[in-house]
């Protein structure tokens, strides 16, 4: 499979989004099937796998999807780019505290479930207006310097937030909704990312099965 660069990361041209192994697209498959599917994708050349801490089996518990992915890729972890995402609730944010500790707590839990000691690409799953993006970006930079993550990204974000974040710590990738029937990214996100050398990782490129 062809390779592409996302910042300092080399990824396969096609990545595997793993959310459907936990929820979102009909009946949740058996774990054994999910693991086999992920490993088969790797056998065919896929070296870019995407998950999130919030992907849970029918919302039973946080981290279900990360656990599946961690088990599946353990044997070839060093050969792939592994992306996951965190969600920070308003209740977790203390304006007088250090948001870094919140990020580190989430990341540590994700790494445990993923059976790894680093994450290649760590996204903020959704921007929370109650939490300044500048503080998130600064903390992501610290995680990069400490070697806990190799790059960071934003998911479903607009240019105003992306630009503020990128000024603090260069953003590796943006993961926004994009397909032949959902093309808003072409207006502002794509031009900004091209100008600033930020990778774009579309989610739902087949419009959740419509295409």
Question: Over which residues does each language-model region extend?
Answer:
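N-terminal binding-site loop/beta-alpha segment at the start of enzyme catalytic domains
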Residues: 1-80
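Alpha-helical scaffolding within the catalytic cores
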Residues: 1-4, 67-70, 106-107, 160, ...
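Conserved, mostly hydrophobic/aromatic
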Residues: 6, 16, 34, 41, ...
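Conserved residues at the C-terminal ends of beta-strands
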Residues: 17, 52, 122-125, 155, ...
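Feature marks short, surface-exposed loop/turn motifs that line or immediately flank catalytic pockets
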Residues: 20-23, 55, 88-90, 125-128, ...
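Short, acidic/polar
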Residues: 28-42, 96-115, 135, 158-164
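Structural motif corresponding to the early beta-alpha repeats
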Residues: 55, 75-98, 125
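Beta/alpha (TIM)-barrel catalytic core signal, keyed to glycine-rich beta->alpha loops juxtaposed to Asp/Glu
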Residues: 127-211
């Amino acid at each position: 499979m062809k390779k592409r660069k996302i910042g300092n990361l080399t990824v396969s041209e096609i990545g595997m989004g793993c959310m459907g192994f936990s929820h979102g697209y009909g009946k949740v498959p058996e774990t054994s099937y999910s693991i086999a599917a992920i490993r088969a994708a790797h056998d065919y050349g896929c070296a870019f796998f995407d998950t999130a801490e919030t992907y849970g089996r029918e919302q039973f518990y946080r981290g279900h999807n990360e656990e599946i992915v961690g088990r599946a890729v353990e044997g070839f972890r060093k050969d792939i780019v592994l992306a996951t995402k965190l969600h920070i609730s308003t209740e977790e944010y203390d304006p007088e505290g250090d948001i870094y500790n919140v990020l580190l707590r989430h990341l540590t839990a994700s790494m445990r479930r993923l059976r790894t000691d680093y994450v290649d690409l760590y996204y903020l799953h959704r921007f929370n207006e109650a939490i300044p993006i500048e503080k998130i970006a600064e903390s992501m930079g610290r995680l990069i310097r400490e070697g806990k993550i190799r790059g960071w990204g934003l998911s479903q974000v607009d240019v105003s937030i992306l630009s503020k974040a990128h000024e603090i710590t260069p953003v590796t990738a943006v993961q926004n909704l994009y397909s032949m029937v959902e093309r808003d990214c072409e207006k502002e996100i794509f031009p900004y990312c091209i100008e600033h050398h930020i990778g774009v990782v579309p989610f739902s490129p087949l419009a959740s099965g419509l295409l």
